[in-house]
Amino acid sequence: MAAATQFLSQPSSLNPHQLKNQTSQRSRSIPVLSLKSTLKPLKRLSVKAAVVSQNSSKTVTKFDHCFKKSSDGFLYCEGTKVEDIMESVERRPFYLYSKPQITRNLEAYKEALEGVSSVIGYAIKANNNLKILEHLRSLGCGAVLVSGNELRLALRAGFDPTKCIFNGNGKSLEDLVLAAQEGVFVNVDSEFDLNNIVEASRISGKQVNVLLRINPDVDPQVHPYVATGNKNSKFGIRNEKLQWFLDQVKAHPKELKLVGAHCHLGSTITKVDIFRDAAVLMIEYIDEIRRQGFEVSYLNIGGGLGIDYYHAGAVLPTPMDLINTVRELVLSRDLNLIIEPGRSLIANTCCFVNHVTGVKTNGTKNFIVIDGSMAELIRPSLYDAYQHIELVSPPPAEAEVTKFDVVGPVCESADFLGKDRELPTPPQGAGLVVHDAGAYCMSMASTYNLKMRPPEYWVEEDGSITKIRHAETFDDHLRFFEGL
């Protein structure tokens, strides 16, 4: 099986139409397109010496954010004024992406991986928009799956099954049978998971390529809700149980082929030496596995690289920084590297766009109330996560700058998008965006309070606007009860 990333090209067919709603005189009219889906169904180095990169001379382009304020005070996405987009689409909260930024983010990983046999597996859980998946697949990406439906969606988007990795601590037998039939990699997470994979192999009549998910117990220094590789995690196996799993694989040669080892430390990681520390341990496990006669050829270091949510000018690790910490380790053992980026591929490509409903004060608290909410974007409420917030247009000259909680209309005190944000007092109807909303935002959206999931658009390379997901409607909700 070829492990290096393949570069596929399959253009989507476009069916453009101009939205009919009028724009204000000071705005230009922006056509919004609707996509019609096109569907297809050993050299030895010492571990200590190996952690220093030999690729540091590579020139990396400085990151230039796709959403930025211009000197005129307006927010632009790839040169297109966000306020103009708001006036050209349905008046409701929506997600707005930069398609070119998605491409640039993936290219950064591909550049970093030059010279390393690799699979870039996009973590579908971060954002499962079908058009985004098709775009990433067309650029040569693989997919990382944590449910049977994510596997089905990956197949619908045209991903090569041999570049897909099925993760999860509770994979069902039905989903494992599908994975076995399609030939995807499966990460073994527990004793019962291994038994189910064996059964799935027998049902499907196909041998399953498996990796062992081993917890290296390296502290990722992140929020406990997104730490996944410590000794008490619900994911993976403890290293002291490794021999039991190796013996079980040996006992089932027709059903299982052990091809690699996997770890996943967590998410929003901002120190790449943490990945290095984990990779050093994983190499030790791989050496032991090979000593027992297994032809292990893959090291999967997971994902989790963080981004600059604060927009405070922090210098964060790049994909090149990440890969350089493990490059020589991987090459020293002649391994194929699998990485599982999600947030770092898609988060900074998107804003959540809202209208200001009004401003109010209670006691010592000032509130900006918007039409978006925790139903559409739950990260701040769930993790107390910070996402940068700003207005899309210049405020009135007399607008006072003060501290606001930015809140939505959902009937929960936890319904906030940001707390204690210094912002100019906005007029009613003003546009307000929550930045870096491409990952774990729309994919975690709900219909709480019957807030229907919003539409999604992206800015194309030529500056045109394309709808990439329809808004959900009240009629969509009622359809679940038809015929009952």
UniProtKB/Swiss-Prot annotation:
It is an enzyme of class 4 (lyase). Its EC number is 4.1.1.20. Pfam families: Orn_Arg_deC_N, Orn_DAP_Arg_deC. The active site is at residue 411. Keywords: Acetylation, Amino-acid biosynthesis, Chloroplast, Decarboxylase, Lyase, Lysine biosynthesis, Plastid, Pyridoxal phosphate, Transit peptide. InterPro entries: Ala_racemase/Decarboxylase_C, DAP_deCOOHase_LysA, De-COase2_C, De-COase2_CS, De-COase2_N, De-COase2_pyr-phos_BS, Orn/DAP/Arg_de-COase, PLP-binding_barrel. Pathway: Amino-acid biosynthesis; L-lysine biosynthesis via DAP pathway; L-lysine from DL-2,6-diaminopimelate: step 1/1. Residues 1-30 are annotated as: Disordered. Residues 1-28 have a biased composition (Polar residues). The modification N-acetylalanine is found at residue 50. It is found in: Plastid, Chloroplast. Pyridoxal 5'-phosphate binds at residues 304, 340-343, 440. Specifically catalyzes the decarboxylation of meso-diaminopimelate (meso-DAP) to L-lysine. Belongs to the Orn/Lys/Arg decarboxylase class-II family. LysA subfamily. This is Diaminopimelate decarboxylase 1, chloroplastic. It comes from Arabidopsis thaliana (Mouse-ear cress).
